[in-house]
């Protein structure tokens, strides 16, 4: 039987983006070889690199390639030298254009503390000793960041007033809740929903709709937490969480807080999924390490590629349906850390420091 071939649009972007993306491609090709399928990568400009070359952060050629692709592997965009540009020409505008084009309404942020790195976590061992492994499912295209009315106005008496509006429909809540429950069903079957229903009407609706969707998933245990309490419980009992479901605003805060539990943002991937489907009927996902472009170390072979590599594992799982290969990549990352291999950002005495390319090769060699 012929090997299936998957088409991946690769958008390295700026700063360390090209280096870490190359590392991810190395590992993904190793996974494809080990598990009997083919990956075809096509590289296109985005962000500052695209602006420098053609004057726009999201060229038509890149857009068309993303339309054709089964998934999008992204590096990073941005840098200080672009900060003076008009917003629609800044590198980040390319990222937002992609989210809007494919209605990427769900952002997935795995929070996993690898046992060899527990000393790098700011939390005490008695709190994290039992392990930390949960995922935050954040609604990405609604809520207070996009609600109307919004703006700054001057009242008749000269007072200036800033207005933002938290708006969610039941349909918007239901679709992100359903994705959260589906992910929980494939994990440890526990979902924690976060809201401020005690003081916000949007929060009351959020909780009501989550409970309605929960009836479709009787095998998943549901817990509701107020957002301020959720922030505290992440620090008190992080090992108790499995899937945490949150609105755009609360998910933004909580995912950054939770990221610090893991010891390094160089290890943290993310996936954005939505309604768009690829040729295989699976989400045309967008996969991005959270660490940013880090222009101060770009081109020095010092960047940690593990977040980008773990983005590759998420791509295999969510957009290609290759759970076997995804687990193999994740196990290979765990293996290199267990063996004491490190990049500069996570090194400690007694470990071997590898550059970006060497770390990627080390992971690829352990994919089987």
Swiss-Prot record:
Substrate binds at residues 99, 109, 138, 228. Pathway: Amino-acid biosynthesis; L-leucine biosynthesis; L-leucine from 3-methyl-2-oxobutanoate: step 3/4. Mg(2+) binds at residues 228, 252, 256. GO terms for biological process: L-leucine biosynthetic process. GO terms for cellular component: cytosol. Its EC number is 1.1.1.85. The record marks 145, 196 as: Important for catalysis. One of its GO terms (molecular function) is 3-isopropylmalate dehydrogenase activity. Its cofactor is Mg(2+); Mn(2+). It is an enzyme of class 1 (oxidoreductase). SMART domains: Iso_dh. Gene3D superfamilies: Isopropylmalate Dehydrogenase. Its main location: cytoplasm. It is found in: Cytoplasm. Binds 1 Mg(2+) or Mn(2+) ion per subunit. NAD(+) binds at residues 79-92, 292-304. Keywords: Amino-acid biosynthesis, Branched-chain amino acid biosynthesis, Cytoplasm, Leucine biosynthesis, Magnesium, Manganese, Metal-binding, NAD, Oxidoreductase. It comes from the Bacteria. It catalyses: (2R,3S)-3-isopropylmalate + NAD(+) = 4-methyl-2-oxopentanoate + CO2 + NADH. PANTHER family: 3-ISOPROPYLMALATE DEHYDROGENASE. Catalyzes the oxidation of 3-carboxy-2-hydroxy-4-methylpentanoate (3-isopropylmalate) to 3-carboxy-4-methyl-2-oxopentanoate. The product decarboxylates to 4-methyl-2 oxopentanoate. Homodimer. Belongs to the isocitrate and isopropylmalate dehydrogenases family. LeuB type 1 subfamily. This is 3-isopropylmalate dehydrogenase. The lineage of its organism: Bacteria, Bacillati, Bacillota, Clostridia, Eubacteriales. The gene is leuB.
């Amino acid at each position: 039987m012929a090997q299936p071939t998957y088409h991946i649009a690769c958008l390295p972007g700026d700063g360390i983006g090209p280096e870490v993306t190359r590392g991810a491609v190395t590992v993904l090709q190793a996974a494809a070889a080990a598990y009997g399928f083919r990956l075809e990568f096509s590289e296109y400009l985005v962000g500052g690199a695209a602006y420098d070359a053609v004057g726009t952060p999201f060229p038509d050629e890149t857009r068309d390639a993303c339309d054709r692709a089964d998934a999008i592997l992204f590096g990073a965009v941005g840098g200080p030298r672009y900060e003076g540009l008009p917003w629609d020409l800044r590198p980040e505008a390319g990222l937002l254009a992609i989210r809007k084009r494919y209605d990427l309404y769900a952002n997935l942020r795995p929070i996993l503390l690898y046992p060899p790195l527990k000393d790098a976590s700011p939390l005490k061992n008695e709190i994290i000793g039992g392990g930390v492994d949960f995922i935050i499912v954040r609604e990405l295209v609604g809520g207070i960041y996009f609600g109307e009315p919004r703006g700054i106005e001057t009242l008749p008496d000269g007072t200036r007033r800033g207005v933002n509006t938290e708006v969610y429909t039941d349909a918007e809540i239901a679709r992100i809740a359903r994705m959260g429950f589906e992910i929980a069903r494939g994990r440890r079957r526990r979902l924690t929903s976060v809201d401020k229903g005690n003081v916000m009407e949007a929060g009351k609706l959020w909780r009501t709709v989550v409970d309605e969707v929960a009836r479709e998933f009787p095998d998943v245990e549901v817990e509701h937490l107020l957002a301020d309490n959720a922030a505290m419980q992440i620090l008190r009992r992080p090992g108790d969480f499995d899937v945490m479901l949150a609105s755009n605003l609360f998910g933004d805060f909580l995912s950054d807080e939770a990221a610090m539990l893991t010891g390094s943002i160089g290890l943290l991937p993310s996936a954005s999924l939505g309604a768009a489907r690829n040729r295989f009927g699976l989400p045309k996902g967008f996969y991005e390490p959270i660490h940013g472009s880090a222009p101060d170390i770009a081109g020095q072979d010092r960047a940690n590629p593990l977040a980008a590599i773990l983005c590759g594992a998420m791509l295999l799982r969510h957009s290609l349906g290759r759970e076997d290969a995804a687990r193999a990549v994740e196990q290979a990352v765990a293996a290199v850390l267990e063996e004491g291999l490190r990049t500069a950002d996570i090194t400690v005495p007694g470990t071997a420091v590898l550059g970006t390319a060497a770390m990627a090769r080390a992971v690829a060699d352990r994919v089987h």
